[in-house]
Design a protein with these regions (language model features):
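Non-catalytic interaction-recognition regions
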Residues: 1-399
Length: 399
């Protein structure tokens, strides 16, 4: 959108020249150009900056007028739909979905209105802009409406939080962003606290670090050095084919999810595609294999062929004790909103089971029944934990 001249002017039919499978890349390239030209990088171009501001104003006007027919509007709506289509496809691929999207066209007007309603009591005028004086609360002062009368990201986030409250009347809203806007979000929530303290109290901000590939390459969405989520999946798939000589999308997806979730939220993530798909160490496939191994034992056993036993031997007791820790671990993960606790537990549980199985015969053993019951509880617990992480627990690791 920031480079309409490259389309030959405002001619929406020119968009047909962009192949369907290249739309996401094209949009990304245009985003990077616009971001760079606006001055988020050091080389700011004032003429381009003003042109982008005017484009932004025109986009707001499109929504105000419900314009779907003008050439500019057709370009805008088409590109926005391309973005939605891409993300819908990707979310389906990773097994998730969003119930509702909140585009800026919905959040910005509400944020603008809300901020204006509280000028004087919460927000103040300053050099033609509207700001929140965060310094009174040990924070910093930020602009919520700029001198052009447009809402900044701060006002849009006020609108987003307000809109979600109107739609869901939630008990808890968790906002997840990068670590670089911790102070920014403190200001936004502190401003809301002044006129809706209950809403601010029900909004929680969690942050994460940056993602780098092993070797130090940073994943970024605002510069030309871009590595998309789909690229991470493709890297894991290639590593899996080389390391395990198998193609299994379910296992690869679980490997990537686990590689991210096992890290405590808040820190940076060093992602190693080969390590993530390995059947050894703290990886998704290791845990999936430990589950498949247990299911294989249960499938081969003829339940009831051995006499019942009472009491537990030391190795059995150790595994049973670890299984029993599961509810407490889940409670802790939920209370802290930290899924890495579940990952750590599942890894330790799988290790415990593997040690147990290596040293204790199960089939055709006088303690077969009690050990099969123990393995059944273990497999169910492992599966439940993986399900909480949205990771599949296959009966067999390789198809």
């Amino acid at each position: 959108m920031g480079d309409i001249e490259n389309l030959g002017g405002e001619y929406p039919e020119k968009l047909k020249d962009v192949p369907e499978d290249e739309r996401a890349d094209w949009l990304t390239e245009e985003y990077v150009k616009g971001s760079y030209a606006y001055g988020e990088e050091e080389v700011a171009n004032e003429q381009a900056r003003q042109a982008i501001i005017e484009l932004n104003k025109r986009i707001y006007k499109i929504h105000e007028d419900n314009d779907h027919d003008s050439p500019f509007a057709q370009i805008y709506w088409t590109c926005r739909q391309w973005s939605y289509d891409y993300f819908d496809k990707f979310y389906a691929q990773i097994g998730t979905k969003f119930e509702k999207y909140y585009p800026e066209s919905e959040t910005a007007p509400l944020g603008l209105t809300t901020v204006r309603e509280h000028i004087g009591s919460v927000y103040q005028e300053s050099d033609g802009a509207i700001v929140f004086d965060g310094e009174k609360y040990g924070l910093h002062t930020r602009v919520f409406i700029n001198s052009n009368g447009l809402p900044t990201y701060e006002a849009k986030d006020v609108g987003l939080i307000m809109k979600k409250w109107q739609d869901y009347n939630f008990d808890l809203s968790v906002v997840i962003t990068g670590n670089d806007i911790i102070e920014y979000m403190k200001v936004v929530l502190k401003s809301i606290e002044q006129f809706m303290p209950e809403l601010a109290a029900r909004s929680r901000h969690l942050t994460h670090g940056i993602v780098k590939l092993a070797g130090g390459t940073k994943m970024s969405s605002r510069t030309g050095n871009i590595l998309r989520a789909i690229d991470v999946l493709e890297a894991a798939n290639e590593a899996n084919k080389k390391l395990n000589e198998q193609e299994n999308p379910e296992t690869v997806l679980g490997a990537v999810k686990y590689a991210f979730l096992k890290n405590r939220m808040g820190g940076d993530i060093i992602y190693d595609p080969v390590e993530s798909v390995s059947l050894e160490g703290n990886s998704g496939p290791y845990i999936q294999y430990a589950h498949a191994r247990a299911r294989s034992i249960l499938a081969k056993a003829s339940s009831g062929s051995q006499a019942s036993q009472t009491g537990l031997e030391p190795d059995e007791r150790s595994l049973a004790r670890k299984i029993g820790e599961y509810p407490e671990v889940v409670d802790k993960a939920v209370a802290e909103l930290m899924p890495h606790h579940i990952c750590t537990y599942l890894y330790e549980l799988a290790q415990n089971f593997n040690r147990f199985y290596e040293h204790n015969r199960v089939i055709d053993n006088e303690r077969q029944n009690i050990r099969l019951q123990l393995i059944q509880h273990y497999a169910n617990t492992l599966k439940n934990g993986l399900n909480l992480l949205s990771i599949a627990a296959p009966e067999r690791l390789w198809a």
